C-alpha cells in the first residue's frame, strides 16, 4: 500500500466486484494492485468475460486537489477518444464513471496492454527504433488542434480562451490563493510570479494554434508492447493533465526523451531561438508551481516542494534580470 500519498486508498474486494459488475457486467477472477501511483489507485484485473483490464480509481481527500484535478478522469477519457479518432496509440477506454454511483470515487477502466512502461524496459538494442516510434506518436498527438486554448473538457464543451496568455494567466491566478494558504510562496513572491507571466503575454501570444499537449510524458506513462515478434511502442497513457496549448510545453520540464532518435520521429529539433527558450523556461515555472502544490499538499513530500519552488524563484530572477537589460 502507498502510505505517502494522502489521495491513495485501496478498494475492498466487495468494491472491486461492484465496480466490475456495474461497468462491464462481469466478475473479478483476479485483481492485483499496480505500484507507482500516487494520485489514482490502479489495479490490473482479470475478468470472467471481458479479458484483462486496468481499473483506475480516483483519489480520496478531494478537498486537497487543485481545481482542475477534480476533472482529471473526464479529461483523460476525452483524450483517449480523440486519440482513437486520430489513430494515435493510446489506451482503449472501456468504462468511465464520474457520477460516483457505485463507489464514492471516480473510476475508469481501460483495456490492458501487455508490455512494460519505458522506465521498466531494458532491451537496449530496441530502444533507438522505439524512441523514433515514440517521437512520431507524440508528433501526431501534438498535431491535433482545437479552436481555443484550455483544458480539454472546457474546450470540447465550447469554452476555453482565445489567447494562449489568457489560459496561462488563468492558471497562475487559480494557483496563487492555494499557494498562499500552503505557504509555498510569500505574498510578494506571488505578485512577482503574476507580474512575470503578465509581462510576457505578448511572447506567449506568438503561439496562435492550440495543439493537443499531454504535459506529463514521463517514462512511466509510455508503454512498450512486448507481445509481438519484437518490442514496439505501444501507447501513450495517463493524459489526464492534457490541454490545448503550445506543444513545446511537453519539453519544458521532462526532457529525458529528447534523443536523436526521438527527434527524428518527432520531425526535428526543438526551436532554439530566444523567444522559444524563454517560453519553455516560463512553462517550466508554471509546471513546477503545480508540482510543488501536489508534493506538499497531496503527496507529503516537503523536500520536493522546496526544490520545485527554489527553481521557480530562480526562473523569476532570471526573467527579471533580462527585462532590466
Predicted regions and their residues:
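Short strand-connecting beta-turns/loops that link adjacent beta-strands
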Residues: 48-50, 101, 227-230, 285-288
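ATP/Mg2+ or Mg2+-diphosphate-binding catalytic cores
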Residues: 3-8, 291-325
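A short secondary-structure junction motif
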Residues: 179-182, 218, 253, 290-302
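Short beta-strand segments
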Residues: 56-57, 94-95, 150-153, 212-215, ...
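Active-site Asp-x-Gly
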Residues: 210-213, 218-281, 291
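Membrane-proximal envelope and lipid/glycan-remodeling enzymes
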Residues: 53-55, 65, 284, 291, ...
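An alpha-helical support segment within catalytic cores of ATP-dependent transferases
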Residues: 9-27, 101, 124, 128-132, ...
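ATP-binding pocket architecture of kinase catalytic cores
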Residues: 32-174, 178-180, 184
Amino acid at each position: 500500500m502507498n502510505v505517502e500519498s494522502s489521495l491513495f486508498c485501496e478498494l475492498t474486494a466487495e468494491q472491486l466486484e461492484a465496480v466490475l459488475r456495474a461497468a462491464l457486467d462481469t466478475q473479478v477472477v483476479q485483481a492485483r494492485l499496480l505500484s507507482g501511483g500516487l494520485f489514482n489507485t490502479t489495479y490490473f484485473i482479470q475478468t470472467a468475460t471481458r479479458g484483462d483490464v486496468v481499473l483506475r480509481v480516483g483519489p480520496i481527500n478531494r478537498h486537497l486537489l487543485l481545481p482542475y484535478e477534480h476533472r482529471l478522469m473526464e479529461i483523460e477519457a476525452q483524450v483517449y477518444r480523440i486519440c482513437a479518432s486520430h489513430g494515435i496509440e493510446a489506451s482503449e477506454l472501456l468504462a468511465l464513471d464520474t457520477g460516483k454511483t457505485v463507489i464514492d470515487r471516480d473510476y475508469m477502466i481501460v483495456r490492458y496492454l501487455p508490455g512494460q512502461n519505458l522506465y521498466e524496459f531494458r532491451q537496449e538494442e530496441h530502444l533507438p527504433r522505439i524512441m523514433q516510434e515514440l517521437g512520431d506518436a507524440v508528433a501526431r498527438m501534438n498535431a491535433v488542434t482545437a479552436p481555443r486554448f484550455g483544458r480539454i473538457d472546457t474546450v470540447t464543451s465550447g469554452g476555453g480562451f482565445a489567447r494562449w496568455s489568457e489560459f496561462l494567466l488563468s492558471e497562475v491566478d487559480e494557483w496563487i490563493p492555494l499557494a498562499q494558504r500552503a505557504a509555498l510562496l510569500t505574498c510578494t513572491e506571488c505578485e512577482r510570479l503574476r507580474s512575470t507571466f503578465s509581462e510576457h503575454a505578448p511572447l506567449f501570444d506568438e503561439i496562435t494554434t492550440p495543439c493537443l499537449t499531454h504535459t506529463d510524458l514521463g517514462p512511466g506513462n509510455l508503454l512498450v508492447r512486448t507481445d509481438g515478434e519484437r518490442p514496439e511502442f505501444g501507447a501513450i497513457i495517463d493524459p489526464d493533465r492534457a490541454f490545448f496549448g503550445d506543444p513545446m510545453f511537453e519539453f519544458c520540464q521532462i526532457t529525458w526523451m529528447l534523443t536523436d532518435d526521438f527527434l527524428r520521429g518527432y520531425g526535428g529539433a526543438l526551436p532554439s531561438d530566444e523567444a522559444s527558450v524563454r517560453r519553455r523556461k516560463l512553462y517550466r515555472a508554471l509546471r513546477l508551481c503545480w508540482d510543488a502544490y501536489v508534493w506538499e499538499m497531496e503527496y507529503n513530500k516537503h523536500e520536493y516542494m522546496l526544490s520545485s519552488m527554489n527553481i521557480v524563484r530562480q526562473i523569476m530572477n532570471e526573467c527579471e534580470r533580462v527585462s532590466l537589460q
